[in-house]
C-alpha cells in the first residue's frame, strides 16, 4: 500500500461527463494506460493476462477524453459503461491510430474487445520516413515533426510525492493526476498521424506503409498464437547439460588442480600457465585474452574442455533458462519488432524478436543447436513445417541484374528458368573455380564484405585472393556491375529503394581520402572535413537492397498466408515455421507466388516432430 502524501499538486482535470458518439469521424486516435508490472523483465503481460488496462484515452479532431477504470488511487468511472462505449468506438469504420500499436492492440484484445477498420501505427510510419533515427517514442517524434513533446511535469511531481515511478507505476495514482497527460498522448498521436501522412507522401513510402499495415493483423495473431515448448524436456536437457559441463570442468581440475571459472580470463590464464601454454595479451591493459575462436581451435585437450564447457554453459543459461523463464502454460509469446523502433528492430525491414529473442536460438552448432531447437514443438496432431525461400539472396541479385540487362547474367537466368538451378554451382562453373570458393565470394560480395575479410574467409594468401577475385569478376561480371551501379546510385541520390518500395537511406558522410574516419551527418562532416566529402557506407548498398527486398518478400508472403487463415509461429532469417496438417503444398505455392521476380521463386520445405529435427 502506498502512502498518500500530505500535499499534492492542484489539478483542474475532471473525467468526461458523457460518452460521445464518434461515428461521424474518419480517424480516431487511441492511447491506453496500463498496469504492466513485468514489462521490463518479461515483456508485455497482455497475452498472459499479467496486468490490465487502467484507463482509455481517445482523441478526434475536436475532442479528446480520458476514461479511468482501474486506477489504484481511485477516481475511476463505471468499468462496464466505459468498455461498452469503447467497444462502440472500436466498431466504427474509422481508421484507428496508435503509437506502438502492437502494445495497445494486444491489451485491447486481451480485454475481450474487437477492433473494426484499419489500424495504423505512427511509430511504423516514423520508421519508414526515417529508419536511421535514434528514438521513435511519441515524445521524440512529436517534438521533431509537430513541435509538441510530452509534458510529464505534473505527473512526475505527483509520482515523486507518492514515492512511485511516474511511468511504470502510474496506475497507482488517482486518475485526476493522469487524465491530462493521457489525453495529451492521444491528441499528440492524432496530430503526429496528420503530419506523418504528409511525410510519407513526400518520401513516397505510402505503398510500403500499406504493406506494413496489412501485415499488422497477422503479427497480432502470431503474438497470441505463440509457439509451444516442451518444458519437461527443457528441464531434462538443462540437467543433462549441467552434468556435461561439470564433467568438462572435472577433467580440467584432475589435470591441473584448478577450479577454472570459464568466463574469467584470469582464471583461464592459470590453466594455461600450469600447462605451459602461450596465450595473447590485450594491447591496452596487457590482461589475458581468450577469444572464442582461439579456445575452440586450440589443439590442447584441456583447452578444448574449457571451450566445450563454455558452449554448454551458454546453451543452458542463455537459451534454456530463457525458454523456461518466458514459457507460460507451455507456450512462448515472443514480442515481434516489425520495424526499427525503441524496442529493437532493423533498418532493413527484417523482423527482430524480444522476450525472448528467438533469432538467437542457435542454428550453427551442429550438436547443441538441434537439441535446443527440439524444445519447440508444433500444435497437437500437426508436424513442424519449415518453409524458406531457396537461395533468396542470389535470386534477388539475378533479378536486379536481369532488370538492368547486365553482361553475363543471361547464363544464370536461363539456368533458373530451366529448373532446379544452384547459383553457387553455376557461378563456380562460369568462373572455373571450386563451388566452395564461389559461394564464399558470392555471399561476401552480397553482404558488403571488405577484401581483407573475404580473403580471411577464403583462407588463402593475399596474392591467391587477388587472383581469385580477378578471375571471378572477369568471368562473372554482372555481380560487380550490379554492386557498382547500386553503390553509385546510393552515392548520387543518398538512397535506394527495395523491391516493394522500402527506402534505404545513406545519411552519413565521410572525407574522400582513404583512412579511418567517423561518419557524420552532412553539416557536421562539412565543418570537420570541408567540401571534399562523400556518403559513408555505400559499399553496403547492395546488401541493404537485398536484405530489404528479402524482408519485403517474406512480409508479402505472410500477408497472403494470413488471408488464407495460416498463421506462422516464428519468422527467423529466411524461414517461416508453421504447424502443418495436409497444407504444406498450399503454403509453398502461396509463398512462391507472393512476389514476382525475373527468376522463378522456389520455397524449400522440411517437416518433423519438432524444430530440432530440421536441418
List PLM regions with ranges.
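Conserved "right-hand" nucleotidyltransferase catalytic core of DNA-directed polymerases
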Residues: 1-72, 133, 143-368, 377, ...
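Short active-site loop/helix that positions an aromatic residue
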Residues: 36-39, 102-113, 126-129, 268-276, ...
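A common structural junction motif
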Residues: 475-476, 589-599
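Short hydrophobic/aromatic beta-strand micro-patches
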Residues: 457, 577-581
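Nucleic-acid-processing active sites and adjacent nucleic-acid-binding tracks
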Residues: 61-96, 227
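Acidic beta-strand-to-loop metal/phosphate-binding motif
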Residues: 29, 94-101, 386
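Conserved beta-strand -> loop -> alpha-helix junction used to position metal-binding or nucleic-acid-contacting
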Residues: 114-131, 137-140, 420-424
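Conserved catalytic core of nucleic-acid polymerases
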Residues: 217, 224, 277-280, 296, ...
Amino acid at each position: 500500500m502506498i502512502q498518500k502524501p500530505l500535499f499534492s499538486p492542484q489539478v483542474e482535470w475532471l473525467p468526461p461527463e458523457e460518452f460521445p458518439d464518434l461515428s461521424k469521424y474518419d480517424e480516431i486516435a487511441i492511447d491506453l494506460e496500463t498496469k504492466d508490472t513485468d514489462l521490463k523483465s518479461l515483456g508485455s503481460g497482455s497475452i498472459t493476462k499479467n496486468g490490465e488496462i487502467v484507463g482509455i484515452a481517445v482523441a478526434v479532431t475536436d475532442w479528446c477524453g480520458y476514461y479511468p477504470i482501474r486506477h489504484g488511487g481511485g477516481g475511476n468511472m463505471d468499468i462496464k459503461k466505459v468498455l461498452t462505449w469503447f467497444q462502440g468506438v472500436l466498431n466504427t469504420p474509422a481508421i484507428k491510430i496508435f503509437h506502438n500499436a502492437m502494445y495497445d492492440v494486444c491489451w485491447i484484445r486481451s480485454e475481450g474487445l474487437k477492433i473494426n477498420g484499419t489500424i495504423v501505427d505512427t511509430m511504423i510510419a516514423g520508421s519508414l520516413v526515417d529508419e536511421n533515427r535514434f528514438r521513435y517514442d511519441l515524445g521524440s517524434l512529436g517534438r521533431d515533426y509537430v513541435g509538441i513533446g510530452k509534458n510529464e511535469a505534473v505527473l512526475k511531481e505527483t509520482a515523486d510525492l507518492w514515492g512511485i515511478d511516474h511511468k511504470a507505476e502510474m496506475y497507482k495514482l488517482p486518475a485526476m493526476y493522469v487524465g491530462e497527460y493521457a489525453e495529451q498522448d492521444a491528441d499528440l498521436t492524432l496530430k503526429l498521424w496528420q503530419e506523418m501522412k504528409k511525410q510519407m507522401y513526400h518520401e513516397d513510402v505510402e505503398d510500403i506503409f500499406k504493406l506494413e499495415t496489412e501485415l499488422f493483423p497477422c503479427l497480432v495473431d502470431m503474438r497470441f498464437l505463440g509457439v509451444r515448448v516442451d518444458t519437461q524436456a527443457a528441464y531434462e536437457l538443462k540437467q543433462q547439460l549441467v552434468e556435461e559441463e561439470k564433467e568438462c570442468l572435472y577433467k580440467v581440475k584432475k589435470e591441473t588442480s584448478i577450479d577454472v571459472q570459464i568466463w574469467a580470463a584470469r582464471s583461464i590464464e592459470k590453466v594455461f600457465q600450469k600447462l605451459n601454454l602461450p596465450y595473447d595479451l590485450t594491447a591496452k591493459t596487457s590482461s589475458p585474452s581468450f577469444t572464442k575462436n582461439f579456445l575452440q581451435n586450440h589443439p590442447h585437450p584441456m583447452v578444448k574442455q574449457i571451450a566445450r564447457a563454455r558452449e554448454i554453459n551458454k546453451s543452458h543459461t542463455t537459451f534454456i533458462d530463457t525458454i523456461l523463464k518466458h514459457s507460460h502454460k507451455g507456450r512462448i509469446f515472443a514480442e515481434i519488432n516489425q520495424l526499427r523502433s525503441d524496442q529493437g528492430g532493423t533498418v532493413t525491414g527484417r523482423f527482430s524478436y524480444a522476450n525472448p529473442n528467438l533469432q538467437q536460438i542457435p542454428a550453427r552448432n551442429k550438436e547443441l543447436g538441434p537439441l535446443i531447437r527440439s524444445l519447440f514443438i508444433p500444435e497437437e496432431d500437426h508436424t513442424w513445417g519449415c518453409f524458406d525461400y531457396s537461395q533468396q539472396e542470389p535470386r534477388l541479385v539475378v533479378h536486379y541484374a536481369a532488370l538492368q540487362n547486365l553482361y553475363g547474367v543471361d547464363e544464370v537466368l536461363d539456368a533458373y528458368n530451366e529448373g532446379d538451378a544452384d547459383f553457387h554451382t553455376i557461378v563456380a562453373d562460369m568462373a572455373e573455380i571450386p563451388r566452395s570458393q564461389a559461394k564464399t565470394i558470392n555471399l561476401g560480395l552480397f553482404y558488403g564484405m571488405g577484401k581483407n575479410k573475404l580473403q580471411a574467409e577464403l583462407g588463402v594468401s593475399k596474392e591467391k585472393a587477388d587472383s581469385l577475385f580477378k578471375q571471378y569478376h572477369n568471368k562473372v561480371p554482372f555481380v560487380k556491375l550490379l554492386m557498382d551501379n547500386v553503390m553509385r546510385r546510393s552515392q548520387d541520390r543518398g538512397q535506394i529503394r527495395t523491391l516493394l518500395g522500402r527506402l534505404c537511406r545513406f545519411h552519413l558522410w565521410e572525407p574522400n581520402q582513404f583512412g579511418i574516419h567517423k561518419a557524420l551527418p552532412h553539416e557536421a562532416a562539412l565543418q570537420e572535413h570541408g567540401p571534399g566529402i562523400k556518403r559513408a557506407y555505400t559499399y553496403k548498398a547492395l546488401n541493404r537492397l537485398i536484405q530489404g527486398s528479402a524482408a519485403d518478400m517474406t512480409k508479402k508472403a505472410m500477408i497472403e498466408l494470413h488471408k488464407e487463415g495460416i498463421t506462422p509461429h516464428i519468422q527467423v532469417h529466411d524461414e517461416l515455421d508453421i504447424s502443418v496438417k495436409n497444407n504444406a503444398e498450399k503454403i509453398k505455392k502461396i509463398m512462391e507466388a507472393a512476389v514476382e521476380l525475373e527468376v522463378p521463386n522456389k520455397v524449400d520445405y522440411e517437416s518433423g516432430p519438432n524444430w530440432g529435427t530440421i536441418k
